Amino acid sequence: MIATMVSQLVKDASIKELEEAGLGTQYTEHGKGIYPNDSNGVPFTAAYINSVGDPIADLVEDMTAEQKARATYEHLLNLADDEDVIQPLLFLRQREIVHFNRFKELYEKYVSLGY
């Protein structure tokens, strides 16, 4: 969703504006297309998604991922000044909180069952 937001924000930008925003190399390789990568330019990979087949370990990993996503959305909110960007970020941040709480409930249930 963040890649889509960035794509929408740059769709009408000139090449000069992209260069001034530090997106010159991104434009060189990908134009204004969506290319999910982190702030250092490292592309997304499915290797980030891990599962070991143990419900407790997997749920803890899921909860950790939700908290990291929440923190990232908070960092993006701190940088944002456009209400059309802020509102979706607030929604996405809240979604991470809800996901974390659901994973936590399931984690607690598995622990109570002796896993």
Where do the model's predicted regions map?
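Non-heme di-metal
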Residues: 1-115
